[in-house]
A protein has these predicted regions:
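N-terminal nucleotide/polyanion-binding subdomain common to many enzyme families
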Residues: 1-84
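Short glycine-rich anion-binding loops that position phosphate/pyrophosphate groups of nucleotides
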Residues: 40-44, 162-166, 189
Length: 239
């Protein structure tokens, strides 16, 4: 797995899915906790303006690249030659887990109906994964009560889906109290896992054009303006 430092943020690029599975297997075996991320261009830009986010992504064990324009930016700045095939979207997370072991997962975030559907679909598609518990994202009990609930469930992996920067702030403040082996934020992934929000066609995913599908699936001029700023990666490439 190749590792790079881009604007003070460490980035990790596995050579293929097999290596990704190996990385997760080692993290699950590790006696220490691993906080990781799947970072896209929009989040990368956000951390440049948010000191807490910046420190968060500097401190994570691995920041896997989820976004074609972030790959293009490091290509231009670091002389690499990555393509859309080198993205590792957080939405595909369960494909990265080792097939030869049972993994317990706790989901925190999203709506109740999405969590219920996500549990059924994930466990059906990935027999080695068990969603052992979940908590919807709009609970007021996100302090010690929630920490105790998560720890009592004894998950191998905790996925926090509250959107950036809320999920990162919550993880930053609570990670030392949690006993999960792997912890990360994953935005709106539960909505996709539930089937209530459609993903792009496979050919668009392979080409790194999933952002374009999402843009038109939930179009707004504000979202369009934001994507246009990210499109050619120029803001990412600035020193």
């Amino acid at each position: 797995m190749k590792k790079y430092l881009f604007k003070e943020i460490p980035l990790a690029v596995p050579s293929d899915r097999a290596e990704m599975k190996s990385v997760f297997s080692k993290m699950l075996d590790d006696s220490s906790q691993s906080v990781i991320s799947f970072i896209n261009p929009e989040i990368f830009l956000a951390q440049e303006k948010n000191p807490l986010l910046h420190e968060y992504f500097k401190s994570t064990k691995y920041n896997f690249i989820d976004g074609i324009n972030l790959l293009y930016a490091i290509n231009k700045n670091l002389g690499t030659s990555y393509s859309a095939a080198d993205r590792y979207p957080g939405t595909d997370f369960f494909d990265y887990l080792p097939d030869d072991r049972k993994v317990g997962v706790y989901l925190y975030g999203s709506k109740i109906e999405n969590l219920e559907n996500a549990k059924l679909r994930i466990e059906s598609a990935h027999p080695n994964v068990k969603i052992i518990e979940w908590t919807f994202g709009y609970t007021k009990f996100d302090g010690d009560y929630l920490i105790e609930k998560i720890n009592a469930a004894k998950p191998d992996i905790l996925i926090v889906c509250k959107g950036c920067p809320l999920q990162e702030q919550w993880i930053w403040e609570n990670k030392q109290k949690l006993n999960a082996k792997i912890i990360f934020g994953n935005g709106g992934a539960v909505d996709f896992w539930s089937g209530n929000t459609k993903r792009a066609p496979e050919f668009m995913i392979r080409l790194g054009l999933e952002w374009l599908f999402r843009l038109f699936a939930s179009f707004s001029f504000k979202r369009l303006a934001r994507q246009m700023k990210l499109l050619n990666g120029t803001r990412l490439e600035r020193k």
